[in-house]
């Protein structure tokens, strides 16, 4: 199992429940220095109360903790890291970290997982690989004319630490999701000037108006893309943004009023097609991530459309490669459901070898 975030831990829990022994029948490798998956890298100001709803991992009730009752004022990265640490210890999942998987390749009928660890490089010969690497390690910044000539700072969501580093600066925030909105609200009053740009209009919805049908359609679109091997579409673009009191206050102040996307980047700012120019010391790219799949390149699983065809949790091209937390499974509740399904399929496959 490559990755010990929500998807990897969920699969590992069910593998153990189905009779496999952690550390001998299966191993979990994780690149992070500590527990928490991608959450351990989130910015300090992101609180449990303002983060996307985090569903409990399967069996978490056995250790007496729940994200539903966690202190909403605490940093999300700290709470998740703590709960996941307790989870790993309680279920004795024996996660090996920090271990970075460099490649997965074929050797006869076996799969070989090559890795780097603090003790040196090595390899594991295995029958099955569950890829649960998520997306955090593969940030996406779209190309615009002048991108590489910008004299200021390019900062992606993955690199953002706190508003303090932008004190008194002219900042452009790019993106239409909750991360972009969170940065804007945090930077308001700290940055000298804030400009929000997005590729598409932002739909703010009251709590009772949240479009569940659109959300279901967005997840279905992710599933269809995964099955066809296409690039995975955005979920947020199909579901809208909840209009909380904090967000409404930001709208009323004029902080959360997006402009259309600029057409080019210049050394000292950004320019729109109509000639309007905005000086910028930094551009924060809240433009999402792509699945982290580089280590699987030797297996030649990619389709010409750019993605990997995945159905019912496994690769169409190689049924020994499973994908947890991929496409429609990316949410915490989706990862839990998929974890059970993938674990059952893995055990069934192993029993036939």
Outline where the language-model segments fall:
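Redox-cofactor-proximal catalytic regions of oxidoreductases
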Residues: 34-63
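Flavin (primarily FAD) cofactor-binding/catalytic cores of flavoenzymes
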Residues: 1-33, 37-40, 44-45, 69-353
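Short, basic/glycine-rich phosphate-binding loops at helix/coil junctions
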Residues: 56-66, 225-230
């Amino acid at each position: 199992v490559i990755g010990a975030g929500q998807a990897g831990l969920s699969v590992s829990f069910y593998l153990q429940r189905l009779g496999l022994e952690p550390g001998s029948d299966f191993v979990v490798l994780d690149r992070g220095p500590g527990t928490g998956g991608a959450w351990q890298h989130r910015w300090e100001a992101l609180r449990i109360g303002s983060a996307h709803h985090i569903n409990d991992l399967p069996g978490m009730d056995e250790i007496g903790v729940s994200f539903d009752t966690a202190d909403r004022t605490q940093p999300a990265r700290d709470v998740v890291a703590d709960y996941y640490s307790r989870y790993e210890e309680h279920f004795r999942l024996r996660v090996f970290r920090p271990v970075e998987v460099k490649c997965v390749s074929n050797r006869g009928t076996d799969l070989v997982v090559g890795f780097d660890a603090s003790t040196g490089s090595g390899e594991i010969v295995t029958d099955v690989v569950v890829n649960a690497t998520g997306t955090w390690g593969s940030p996406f910044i779209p190309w615009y004319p002048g991108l590489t000539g910008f004299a200021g700072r390019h900062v992606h969501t993955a690199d953002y630490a706190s508003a303090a580093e932008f004190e008194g600066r002219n900042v452009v925030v790019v993106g239409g999701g909750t991360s972009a909105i969170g940065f804007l609200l945090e930077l308001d009053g700290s940055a000298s000037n804030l400009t929000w740009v997005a590729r598409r209009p932002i739909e703010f919805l009251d709590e009772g108006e949240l479009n569940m049908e659109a959300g279901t359609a967005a997840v279905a679109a992710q599933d269809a893309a995964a099955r066809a091997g296409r690039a995975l579409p955005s979920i947020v673009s199909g579901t809208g943004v909840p209009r909380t009191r904090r967000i409404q206050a930001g709208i009323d102040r004029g902080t959360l009023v997006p402009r259309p996307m600029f057409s080019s980047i210049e050394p000292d700012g950004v320019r729109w097609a109509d000639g309007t120019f905005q000086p910028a010391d930094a551009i924060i790219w809240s433009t999402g991530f792509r699945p982290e799949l580089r280590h699987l390149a030797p297996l030649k699983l990619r389709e010409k459309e750019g993605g990997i065809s995945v159905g019912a949790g496994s690769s169409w091209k190689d049924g020994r490669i499973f994908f947890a937390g991929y496409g429609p499974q990316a949410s915490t509740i989706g990862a839990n459901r998929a974890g059970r399904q993938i674990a059952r399929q893995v055990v069934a496959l192993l029993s036939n070898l």
